[in-house]
Structure formats: structure tokens, C-alpha cells
């Protein structure tokens, strides 16, 4: 049993990128589906496929190097981090994204800011 499934997903993506794998499989959940959709929308992964009990994420590379250079879990199971709409951080001076769990669903930081909603700061990706 995993205590932090989102951290597990981020770690699997990080490890697969370091090993230059084409794709990685993570256990399926609605939260992970939403995270994968945001990663695809923002151009950090090529695509993702839903299987019966897993999500297969196709990783993206540019000139042989991973598009994702860093992943960081912010809100953890032992220490939750909540931010208001005005306190949503800019990641790497605007070169990265932060992902929040809000009352409007899982959103990328700029979308949450434009909708004027805050929430739990899940992770940063750059």
C-alpha cells in the first residue's frame, strides 16, 4: 500500500526519464488521470493511455534529453500546503508549472489564478 500515490507517480516519471525509457506505467486513479492530462496539455509528456488498472504515460524528449528537468512534491501526507489565489507561486521564473487541487478540480497554477481559486499545492514541474 502506498502512503503517497502522487509522489510515487512523480518518482516513477523521474526515474523513467533518467533511464531514458519511452513510457512508464503508474497505478490508475482519478487524481493521477487529472495530473497526466495537465502534463499533456502543458507539453511535458507526449500522451497517456488508460488501461484497466494503470495509466501508461509516453514520455517526451527533445534532442535526446528529457523535457521535464525537475519534479517536486510540495504538499505531502504529513504536511499539507494550501495557497490562496494570490499566493500561487511562479515556478522557475515562469518556466515551470505548479499543479493545485482546487474546488474546481485539479488545475495548473495560471488557470487557478485566472479563475481566482486557491487550493492544495500538489507539485511543481519544470
UniProtKB/Swiss-Prot annotation:
<protein>
    <recommendedName>
        <fullName>Small ribosomal subunit protein uS8</fullName>
    </recommendedName>
</protein>
<dbReference type="GO" id="GO:0005840">
    <property type="term" value="C:ribosome"/>
</dbReference>
<keyword id="KW-0687">Ribonucleoprotein</keyword>
<keyword id="KW-0689">Ribosomal protein</keyword>
<dbReference type="GO" id="GO:0019843">
    <property type="term" value="F:rRNA binding"/>
</dbReference>
<comment type="subunit">
    <text>Part of the 30S ribosomal subunit. Contacts proteins S5 and S12.</text>
</comment>
<keyword id="KW-0694">RNA-binding</keyword>
<dbReference type="InterPro" id="IPR047863">
    <property type="entry name" value="Ribosomal_uS8_CS"/>
</dbReference>
<keyword id="KW-0699">rRNA-binding</keyword>
<comment type="function">
    <text>One of the primary rRNA binding proteins, it binds directly to 16S rRNA central domain where it helps coordinate assembly of the platform of the 30S subunit.</text>
</comment>
<dbReference type="Pfam" id="PF00410">
    <property type="entry name" value="Ribosomal_S8"/>
</dbReference>
<comment type="similarity">
    <text>Belongs to the universal ribosomal protein uS8 family.</text>
</comment>
<dbReference type="GO" id="GO:1990904">
    <property type="term" value="C:ribonucleoprotein complex"/>
</dbReference>
<dbReference type="GO" id="GO:0003735">
    <property type="term" value="F:structural constituent of ribosome"/>
</dbReference>
<dbReference type="InterPro" id="IPR000630">
    <property type="entry name" value="Ribosomal_uS8"/>
</dbReference>
<dbReference type="InterPro" id="IPR035987">
    <property type="entry name" value="Ribosomal_uS8_sf"/>
</dbReference>
<dbReference type="GO" id="GO:0006412">
    <property type="term" value="P:translation"/>
</dbReference>
Amino acid at each position: 500500500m502506498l502512503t503517497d500515490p502522487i509522489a510515487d507517480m512523480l518518482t516513477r516519471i523521474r526515474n523513467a526519464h533518467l533511464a531514458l525509457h519511452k513510457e512508464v506505467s503508474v497505478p490508475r486513479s482519478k487524481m493521477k488521470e487529472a495530473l497526466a492530462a495537465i502534463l499533456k496539455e502543458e507539453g511535458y509528456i507526449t500522451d497517456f493511455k488508460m488501461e484497466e488498472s494503470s495509466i501508461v504515460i509516453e514520455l517526451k524528449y527533445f534532442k535526446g534529453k528529457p523535457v521535464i528537468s525537475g519534479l517536486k512534491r510540495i504538499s505531502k501526507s504529513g504536511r499539507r500546503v494550501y495557497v490562496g489565489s494570490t499566493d500561487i507561486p511562479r515556478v522557475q521564473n515562469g518556466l515551470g508549472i505548479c499543479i493545485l487541487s482546487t474546488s474546481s478540480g485539479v488545475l495548473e497554477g495560471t488557470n487557478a489564478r485566472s479563475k481566482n481559486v486557491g487550493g492544495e499545492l500538489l507539485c511543481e514541474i519544470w
